[in-house]
Amino acid sequence: MASGSVAECLQQETTCPVCLQYFAEPMMLDCGHNICCACLARCWGTAETNVSCPQCRETFPQRHMRPNRHLANVTQLVKQLRTERPSGPGGEMGVCEKHREPLKLYCEEDQMPICVVCDRSREHRGHSVLPLEEAVEGFKEQIQNQLDHLKRVKDLKKRRRAQGEQARAELLSLTQMEREKIVWEFEQLYHSLKEHEYRLLARLEELDLAIYNSINGAITQFSCNISHLSSLIAQLEEKQQQPTRELLQDIGDTLSRAERIRIPEPWITPPDLQEKIHIFAQKCLFLTESLKQFTEKMQSDMEKIQELREAQLYSVDVTLDPDTAYPSLILSDNLRQVRYSYLQQDLPDNPERFNLFPCVLGSPCFIAGRHYWEVEVGDKAKWTIGVCEDSVCRKGGVTSAPQNGFWAVSLWYGKEYWALTSPMTALPLRTPLQRVGIFLDYDAGEVSFYNVTERCHTFTFSHATFCGPVRPYFSLSYSGGKSAAPLIICPMSGIDGFSGHVGNHGHSMETSP
């Protein structure tokens, strides 16, 4: 048997099958296997019965083991033999099994240690060979580089985890705050409704008492009259059956008493009670209608907020393309604001530029997916915003309509809002638009507009057919007064907690200014 094989056998015999290290206080079990004392303690825990061998899984009714001192001594000898091996790369690696020479070289092609005879052999001729020590140092350097890289990645992962934990805590704190606000608001609403309920029920109690007090006297009087009439009827019936002599006695008085009885007037409910009940019923009807309107408005507002929030999930940052701007339009340095000037700039008449109407396009181009952005129109009196195809005519007259590749809404002279359909559609808005949200669903062929301030839907172009890339579209003119203020594209990063390009499930093409 080769010496290397003997060494391997000795190492296997002195290695714990659980921790795969040299035995430390080996304990022999009834099945004959040896396990480190500490390993047995970890495997068995506090169990005293029905324990099993970690190696062969044989079960023992009682916890029984005994120290194997002989194996412990052999283990110490094997460890000493390994520490007394010859030093140096050749001694550490051993000798070449083929040539019985020390392994002092390393073949880079075959990635294995070799001896000097192997280096001269045909098998390794022409291979890149390094001294073993140099190869080991190189590998150690590579390992160190990988260790440094992995440690950096680990540190980054830890920071990301900490950021995630912080974000989770902050978001959960926000949801808890919202939860507490909802509970508080509904408690206030509940108490308010309960107070109204108590007041209405108390008013009903007052009406009940008024009804009793007002009608009970009349009912008591009727009861007395009925009792008197019953007595008189009984007397007349008795008189009617008497013999002639008795019947004629006091007949005049008897008939006179009957004749004095008058037919009662028709019953009339006290009008003041009817009026009070009518007023109360009107209050209840008003309350019912108010609660119904409140419920419907709350449901409608929740749906509006949800619809707008879903659109805002597809937020993109839009900027103005100066190569397309009409010369009278002045763009800001950050390409997010545009205002009208009577003085035209001296700009090149490139093919992309509008040369007759005060229009400018935005970037990027959209070729698929869903995209949302917002525009601050403020108090401007004349403007048009929306989307258009990138291929629209830039020179000469242009009519903003779907058949020409435009899908937009417009304000005329600060009074009339229009959707530029064909023919145009009037938009009877309850409140003026200050901030407009534009939502493009390219694949569905829809362009929607929202009143961001009121959180409500304004208009949607449906069944649009886009022939190529689509771009944000802006047009404005000067009409004096407040309308001289710029039209502003709102930065979408951080809008109400949303980040730009969150959920932008689509494709866009950047256009370089």
Swiss-Prot record:
Summarize tissue expression.
Expressed in testis namely within the seminiferous tubules.
Main EC class the enzyme belongs to: transferase
Classify the source by domain of life. Answer: Eukaryota
A cellular component term (GO) from this record?
A: cytosol
The Gene Ontology biological process annotation of the record reads: Arp2/3 complex-mediated actin nucleation; innate immune response; negative regulation of adaptive immune response; negative regulation of autophagy; negative regulation of calcium ion import; negative regulation of gene expression, epigenetic; negative regulation of interleukin-2 production; negative regulation of protein kinase activity
Name under which the protein is recorded: Zinc finger protein RFP
Task: Name the protein family.
Answer: Belongs to the TRIM/RBCC family.
Q: Which UniProt keywords apply?
A: Chromosomal rearrangement, Coiled coil, Cytoplasm, DNA-binding, Endosome, Metal-binding, Mitochondrion, Nucleus, Proto-oncogene, Repressor, Transcription, Transcription regulation, Transferase, Transport, Ubl conjugation pathway, Zinc, Zinc-finger
Q: Which residues form a coiled coil?
A: 132-172, 282-311
For this protein, the record's SMART domains field holds:
BBOX, PRY, RING, SPRY
Positions of RING-type zinc fingers: 16-57
Q: Which reaction does it catalyse?
A: S-ubiquitinyl-[E2 ubiquitin-conjugating enzyme]-L-cysteine + [acceptor protein]-L-lysine = [E2 ubiquitin-conjugating enzyme]-L-cysteine + N(6)-ubiquitinyl-[acceptor protein]-L-lysine
Q: How does it assemble?
A: Homomultimerizes. Part of a complex consisting of TRIM27, USP7 and MAGEL2; directly interacts with USP7. Interacts with PML, EIF3S6, EPC1, CHD4 and EID1. Interacts with MAGED4, MAGEF1 and MAGEL2. Interacts with PTPN11. Interacts with autophagy receptor p62/SQSTM1.
Q: What task does this protein carry out?
A: E3 ubiquitin-protein ligase that mediates ubiquitination of various substrates and thereby plays a role in diffent processes including proliferation, innate immunity, apoptosis, immune response or autophagy. Ubiquitinates PIK3C2B and inhibits its activity by mediating the formation of 'Lys-48'-linked polyubiquitin chains; the function inhibits CD4 T-cell activation. Acts as a regulator of retrograde transport: together with MAGEL2, mediates the formation of 'Lys-63'-linked polyubiquitin chains at 'Lys-220' of WASHC1, leading to promote endosomal F-actin assembly. (Microbial infection) Positively regulates hepatitis C virus replication by suppressing type I IFN response during infection.
Query: Which InterPro entries has this protein been placed in?
Result: B30.2/SPRY (IPR001870), B30.2/SPRY_sf (IPR043136), Butyrophylin_SPRY (IPR003879), ConA-like_dom_sf (IPR013320), PRY (IPR006574), SPRY/PRY_TRIM27 (IPR035791), SPRY_dom (IPR003877), TRIM/RBCC (IPR050143)
Q: Name one GO molecular function term.
A: DNA binding
Give the positions of the site Breakpoint for translocation to form the TRIM27/RET oncogene: S315, V316
* Residue ranges constituting the B30.2/SPRY domain according to the UniProt record: 298-492
Source organism (scientific name):
Homo sapiens
